Curated annotation (Swiss-Prot):
PROSITE patterns recorded: RIBOSOMAL_L5
Gene Ontology MF annotations: RNA binding; rRNA binding; structural constituent of ribosome; tRNA binding
Protein name, UniProt field: Large ribosomal subunit protein uL5
Function: This is one of the proteins that bind and probably mediate the attachment of the 5S RNA into the large ribosomal subunit, where it forms part of the central protuberance. In the 70S ribosome it contacts protein S13 of the 30S subunit (bridge B1b), connecting the 2 subunits; this bridge is implicated in subunit movement. Contacts the P site tRNA; the 5S rRNA and some of its associated proteins might help stabilize positioning of ribosome-bound tRNAs.
GO CC aspect terms: cytosolic large ribosomal subunit
Assembly with partners or alone: Part of the 50S ribosomal subunit; part of the 5S rRNA/L5/L18/L25 subcomplex. Contacts the 5S rRNA and the P site tRNA. Forms a bridge to the 30S subunit in the 70S ribosome.
NCBIfam families with a match to the protein in the record: PRK00010.1 (NF000585)
Source organism, top-level taxon: Bacteria
Organism: Rhodopirellula baltica (strain DSM 10527 / NCIMB 13988 / SH1)
C-alpha cells in the first residue's frame, strides 16, 4: 500500500502536527473543534483597464490561472459610473477561491517563495484583519510569482489575497498565520510599551 502521507501538503501536515497543538496550548481550547483553522484563500484582481481593452482582462485571467491552478471567475460591475466609462454588467476583474489541498499548497508557495521575492520586503502588516479573524494581503504586482513569464506582461497588476479562518478573534487568526510562517512585521516599540 502506498504511503498516503506523501500526498498531504506540507502546510496541512504542519497544521496537524504543530500549529493545532500550539494554538490549543496558548488559548486553552477544551475541544479540538474550537481550534481555529484556515477555511479558504480568495485571490481577487480588479482590472480597471479592462474597460478600454479586453486583452488586459484576458492576461489577468491567464496569470491567475497559472498562479492558482484554477480557472478564475470573471467579476462584473454592479453599477454604472460615467466618470470611469463603466457600465453595469461589464467585466472588470477576476477572482479565485482555493480550498483544501490547493489552499495549503498555495499558502506554502506564498510563504516560502513569493513573499521573499517582494522588493523591499520587511514583513506584512499586522493590522489588515477585519475584526472577525480574516486577513487580507495586498500585492502590488503579480510578477513576484515564479510561475509567470515576465515578458508576457506589459504592465504590473496588483491583487488582493484574503485568508478566511474559523478564528473568533484577530489575535487567534494572527497567531495561527504566524505559526504557518507568515512573516508579520514586528510591533513598534511604542505599541510594545503601551501593551505592557
Amino acid at each position: 500500500m502506498p504511503n498516503m502521507s506523501s500526498n498531504i501538503p506540507r502546510m496541512q501536515q504542519r497544521y496537524d502536527e504543530s500549529v493545532r497543538a500550539a494554538l490549543t496550548e496558548t488559548y486553552g481550547y477544551k475541544n479540538v473543534h474550537q481550534v481555529p483553522r484556515l477555511l479558504k484563500i480568495s485571490m481577487n484582481m480588479g482590472v480597471g483597464a479592462a474597460v478600454g481593452d479586453k486583452k488586459v482582462l484576458d492576461l489577468a485571467i491567464d496569470s491567475m490561472t497559472q498562479i492558482t491552478g484554477q480557472k478564475p471567475v470573471t467579476t462584473i460591475a454592479r453599477k454604472s459610473i460615467a466618470g470611469f466609462r463603466l457600465r453595469e454588467g461589464m467585466p472588470i476583474g477576476c477572482m479565485v477561491t482555493m480550498r483544501r489541498q490547493r489552499m495549503y499548497e498555495f499558502l506554502d508557495r506564498l510563504v516560502s517563495i513569493v513573499l521573499p521575492r517582494v522588493r523591499d520586503f520587511r514583513g506584512i502588516s499586522r493590522k489588515a484583519f477585519d475584526g472577525n479573524g480574516n486577513y487580507t494581503l495586498g500585492l502590488n504586482e503579480q510578477l513576484v510569482f515564479p510561475e509567470l513569464n515576465p515578458d508576457k506582461f506589459v504592465r504590473p497588476q496588483g491583487m488582493n489575497i484574503s485568508f478566511v479562518t474559523s478564528a473568533k478573534t484577530d489575535d487567534e487568526a494572527r497567531e495561527m498565520l504566524r505559526l504557518f510562517g507568515m512573516p508579520f512585521k514586528q510591533p513598534k516599540e511604542k505599541e510594545q510599551a503601551g501593551a505592557a
